[in-house]
Swiss-Prot record:
Keyword DNA damage found: yes
Keywords: DNA damage, DNA recombination, DNA repair
InterPro entries listed in its UniProt record: ARFGAP/RecO (IPR037278), DNA_rep/recomb_RecO_N (IPR022572), NA-bd_OB-fold (IPR012340), RecO (IPR003717), RecO_C (IPR042242)
Family: Belongs to the RecO family.
Function: Involved in DNA repair and RecF pathway recombination.
Protein name, per record: DNA repair protein RecO
Recorded GO CC terms: bacterial nucleoid
A Pfam family matched in the record: RecO_C
GO biological process: DNA recombination; double-strand break repair
């Protein structure tokens, strides 16, 4: 396939040195998925391309590509940066993990569909100071769909009940209503409030997530359950997740 110049709308992440003065960076795009671009001369002093491809920069990028392998950045326009994600260590850690999860869910150049808007909205919320942990938990739950291991959280696995108190079963991959607690041995015996929060984050659109304050212990408990889902269903062992967990210890 011949190479062509194409304008893509996207966000830059995962930047690393390549050759003497170049960098390779990943870009998450609205219509062409995630792929790698070679930013030539990015490490040279006063490089315009380098400044426009710092992590968490977003805008329109003109690339030379044949839609496989490494594409090459030619120029850009209307580029801005989510500066708080770049400057604030905690926001950076959460955002890097969110993007890493997305990156591992798709092969390069595959359309990521509605997940583009989900991630952009999540990053904008984190950048503006909203609860990064809760936003990340929401993205974690929704991205399980991209991995093909989404649990059933909208209704009881046994009877289909949608309201009431629920528990969760890792083995069965979904929620159990209180009518069937005694008939299911493989449940986690969670506080119903934890399950309710997880259900809300999984089922509600991110646009409806306002600036809410969640009890710190409840937020911690829901995070542990979601982490167990990822370990049981995927076991990704991402460096960004390990760093985020280490950061939480301080």
């Amino acid at each position: 396939m011949a190479r062509e110049l194409c304008e893509v709308q996207g966000l830059i992440f995962k930047r690393k040195k390549y050759k003497e003065a170049d960098v390779l960076t990943k870009i998450m795009t609205k219509d062409h998925g995630i792929f790698t671009i070679d930013v030539r001369g990015a490490l040279r002093p006063k490089s315009r391309l380098g400044a426009a491809t710092l992590n968490f920069s977003y805008g329109k990028y003109i690339v030379n590509t044949n839609w496989k392998g490494i594409s090459t950045l030619r120029t850009f326009k209307d580029v801005k940066q989510l500066d708080q994600l770049y400057l604030d260590l905690t926001k950076n850690a959460y955002s890097s993990y969110v993007l890493d999860l997305l990156d591992h869910a798709f092969v390069e150049y595959k359309d990521i569909g509605s997940f583009y808007d989900l991630i952009i909205k999540a990053l904008l919320k984190i950048n503006s100071g909203e609860d990064a942990a809760i936003i990340t938990q929401m993205v974690q739950l929704k991205l399980l769909n991209a991995y093909g291991v989404a649990p059933q959280l909208d209704r009881c696995l046994i009877c289909g009940k949608v309201q009431g108190k629920f528990d969760y079963s890792l083995e069965l991959g979904g929620i159990i209503c209180s009518d069937h607690f005694n008939s299911v041995s493989q449940r986690m015996h969670l506080d119903p409030k934890v399950v309710a929060l997880i259900r809300t984050l999984a089922l509600v659109d991110i646009d409806r997530l306002g600036k809410i304050k969640i009890n710190p212990q409840l937020k911690k408990d829901s995070g542990k359950v979601i982490d167990r889902m990822y370990v049981n269903y995927l076991d990704l062992n991402l460096k960004t997740k390990k760093f985020l967990d280490e950061l939480a210890l301080f």
